[in-house]
């Protein structure tokens, strides 16, 4: 009899075949299209025949932490609580990184699978995600970033550098993601986990547009690993945490709205607080600039007036109240500001100009965060069954689809 587990009000059938769910960070669908057109992704091209290729929506804000945690909980941020890479903790009155598992409000499917007796493995590119994804997980869990520190007691596996045959990659490199895939292949070949979650970094997508030689080479690398996983009998399910767009004008200059500077000029200093949830320890490739921001208002600043002021700025797509944003994007009310501001497709939002170091932006700015980066792929190496009319699909449906609806 098929064993079921229930997690966050959804049921999952435990698979008898190794299942690999892959989150390709920043995978705007055009990257795949261009790689296929260039003949660089033959395995992905074949999936239109024997697999399933769909499109879904990611969570907004379209950032790494909220979406990875939505995928592994099968639920939106209103359930699991992770609504950014960075947030303002109103209890401590401090701006803090959301990398600690203490901020997680829901169990993960990964941990519950392990409790049910499955061997579960998690490999992330950046170490910032490891504590969140590995929360209460008794299995294998490590990052490529700190692969030289992997040990049996803490990570469930050892000698990973020797097994993979690669040195520890730079966190700002395509090699960081390739290490994830190579480690996944080693685990599949040797330990053969029942379920594996692989999460990459979007360094390449931040630097290189779809169809460029660098982007096509990166997708060719991934395609070769997808094929090898398939040849070893694994169920392969691929999605993304968010898309990616250029955030520049016609000649490649960054389109940045420094909201804190604009609000200070309008209302005075210390009257508002702009918080950018894209902020994380790795800012070189995006300068902590994304298309989503939250704004906290002091008592003397009228909300309606602030909404009208922000909405009138060229490049702003929408301004929502806290309740509107939480309803539309399924966010936790106690962890966002009074207002949510969304940038248009070609525009990013900053705080104050002197708080952003743009020296690392050696190529035209590409970033994410808004609704313009919400469309992501849902790709499987099997046919879907039992979904005559799937309706709106989300990236956090991928584990349900991979375990409950594949032929």
Curated annotation (Swiss-Prot):
The keyword Metal-binding applies. Completely inhibited by EDTA and 1,10-phenanthroline. Moderately inhibited by the phosphonocarboxylic acids phosphonoformate and 3-phosphonopropionate and the phosphonate herbicide glyphosate. Partially inhibited by the reducing agents sodium sulfide and dithiotheitol and the chelating agent iminodiacetate. Nonphosphonate analogs of phosphonoacetate, such as arsonoacetate, sulfonoacetate and malonate are poor inhibitors. Inorganic phosphate, acetate and the known phosphonotase inhibitor phosphite have little effect on activity. CDD domains: Enpp. InterPro entries: Alkaline_phosphatase_core_sf (IPR017850), Phosphodiest/P_Trfase (IPR002591), Phosphonoacetate_hydro (IPR012710), Phosphonoacetate_hydro_insert (IPR023116). Keywords: Hydrolase, Metal-binding, Zinc. Zn(2+) 1 binds at residues 25, 64, 241-242. Its EC number is 3.11.1.2. Induction: By phosphonoacetate. Pfam families: Phosphodiest. Homodimer. This is Phosphonoacetate hydrolase. It comes from Pseudomonas fluorescens.
């Amino acid at each position: 009899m098929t064993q079921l587990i229930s997690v966050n009000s959804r049921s999952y059938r435990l698979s008898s075949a190794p299942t690999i769910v892959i989150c390709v960070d920043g995978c705007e669908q055009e990257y795949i299209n261009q790689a296929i057109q260039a003949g660089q992704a033959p395995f992905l091209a074949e999936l239109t025949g024997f697999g399933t290729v769909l499109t879904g929506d990611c969570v907004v804000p379209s950032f790494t932490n909220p979406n990875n945690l939505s995928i592994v909980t099968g639920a939106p941020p209103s359930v699991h609580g992770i609504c950014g890479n960075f947030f303002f903790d109103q209890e401590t009155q401090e701006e803090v990184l959301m990398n600690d598992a203490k901020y997680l409000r829901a169990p993960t499917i990964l941990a519950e699978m392990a409790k049910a007796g499955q061997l579960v493995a998690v490999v992330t590119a950046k170490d910032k995600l490891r504590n969140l994804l590995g929360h209460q997980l008794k299995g294998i869990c490590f990052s490529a970033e700190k692969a030289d520190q992997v040990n049996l007691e803490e990570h469930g596996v050892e000698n990973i550098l020797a097994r993979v045959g690669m040195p520890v990659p730079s966190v700002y490199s395509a090699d960081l993601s390739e290490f994830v895939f190579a480690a996944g292949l080693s685990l599949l070949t040797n330990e053969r986990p029942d379920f594996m979650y692989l999460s990459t970094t979007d360094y390449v997508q931040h630097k290189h547009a779809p169809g460029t030689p660098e982007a096509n080479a990166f997708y060719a690398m991934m395609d070769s690993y997808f094929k090898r996983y398939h040849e070893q009998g694994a169920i392969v399910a691929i999605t993304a945490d968010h898309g990616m767009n250029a955030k520049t004008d016609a000649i490649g200059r960054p389109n940045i709205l420094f909201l804190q500077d604009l609000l200070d000029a309008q209302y005075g200093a210390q009257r508002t607080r702009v918080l950018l949830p894209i902020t994380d320890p790795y800012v070189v490739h995006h300068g902590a600039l994304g298309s989503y921001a939250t704004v906290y208002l002091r008592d003397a600043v009228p909300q309606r007036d602030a909404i009208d002021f922000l909405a009138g700025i060229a490049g702003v797509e929408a301004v929502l109240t806290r309740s509107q944003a939480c309803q539309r994007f399924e966010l936790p009310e106690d962890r966002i500001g009074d207002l949510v501001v969304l940038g248009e497709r070609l525009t990013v939002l900053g705080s104050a100009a002197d708080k952003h170091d743009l020296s690392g932006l050696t190529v035209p700015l590409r970033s994410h965060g808004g609704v313009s980066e919400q469309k992501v792929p849902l790709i499987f190496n099997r046919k879907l069954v039992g979904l005559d009319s799937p309706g709106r699909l989300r990236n956090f449906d991928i584990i349900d689809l991979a375990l409950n609806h594949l032929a």
